[in-house]
Amino acid sequence: GNLHGSPKVNTAILAIGTVLASIMGTTGAAMLLIRPLLRANDNRKHKVHVVVFFIFLVANIGGSLTPLGDPPLFLGFLKGVPFFWTMTNIWYDTVVAAVILLAVFYAIDSYYYHRREEEMPSTMDPTPDTSKLGFDGTLNFVWLAGAIGFVLLSGLWKSGVEFNILGTPVALQNIVRDVGLITMAYLSWQTTAKSVRVENDFSFAPVFEVAKLFVAIFITIAPVIAMLQAGANGPFAGLVSLVHDANGVPIDERYFWATGMLSGFLDNAPTYLVFFNLAGGDVARLTTELASTLAAISAGSVFMGALSYIGNAPNFMVKAVAEHSGLKMPSFFGYMAWSFCILIPLFLLLTVLFFCFTYNSLIVC
């Protein structure tokens, strides 16, 4: 079928994707919905803002409620953070951020849709209307459930067995998880009709483009992460002192911004671990006495991954898919103009609402 990208339809798709991101991961939700969203808006002239807000909400902020949502939270889960801890502790942060962004998006999209009169005539719509909307390839929901199951398995099952692979210890449960994920992907490829992928404009080109970029990013950020891990004894000692008071007590709002800003331009998963350990690394203490600090670290690493294309892998994947469909997306700094103008004021508001008054000494921002 063919959805028509009105403000209500677009906002509904973004809202659904935001919810799905914590269930099937930001990458899964983004890849599931980006092509239908692009097709729904293929008869509109102004649609870059639609993809930008899609990155904000579906590829980032929506994944903040469970370890399935985003890699930083999954690493926390592997460290022993309870599965529903993030949902319990940053639920309000996520809802406030999502509702505000959806409202801002609806206002911007309504302006373009109603005042700019930029919708093309229906006869020029590249996607023709059909009698009904529906799903093809529904068997893939089974393989998706299997993939989620393997991810959860690696966090819940502690085999106690490790293998040394090229000098890196790899736990048995992680090997089982990775083999399971590859198997689910293979079954999906084999059981899905080629016509479904053709009709969905599926291509490996965006995946390869993102893979090349992130291999380079992971190699180049390794020294930076190592310097951060050195803590007070490394070149970032000033940052360590910045996020604690004179008595060594964590300052939540500073953890939120330090974790977030670095996550926006480095890989957010190792950045989360750096600040997790910087805050003490004691799961029992971080999930109770220092719960507000861990909430700040969790929210910062997930939310601020939206600040740049390289803050989170789905960001660049969405950009690549959009460009592959023919949409001219903003440059790296062009996207940052959008993200900083919209997200920084939002994050300042979240700081005041959720992090400024949690600090033990009641320091006011």
Residue ranges and their predicted role:
Residues G1-L3, L38-N41, I108-Y111, L187-F202:
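C-terminal ends of transmembrane helices
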Residues L101-F163:
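Long, contiguous bundles of hydrophobic transmembrane helices that form the permeation core
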Residues A21, M31-H46, V50-V52, V58, ...:
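Membrane-interfacial helix-loop connectors
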Residues W143-V274:
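Transmembrane helical segments that form the transport core of multi-pass membrane transport proteins
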Residues A21-S22, T26-A29, I90-V99, Q173-M184, ...:
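Structural signature of hydrophobic alpha-helical transmembrane segments
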Residues A12-V19, I55-G63, T123-T130, V207-I221, ...:
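Small-residue-rich segments of transmembrane alpha-helices in multi-pass membrane proteins
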Residues N10, F53, S131-W143, D201-V215, ...:
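Alpha-helical transmembrane segments and their helix-start/interface "positive-inside/aromatic belt" motifs
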Residues L65-T66, L75, F84-D129, F303-C365:
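Juxtamembrane and boundary regions of transmembrane helices in multi-pass small-molecule transporters
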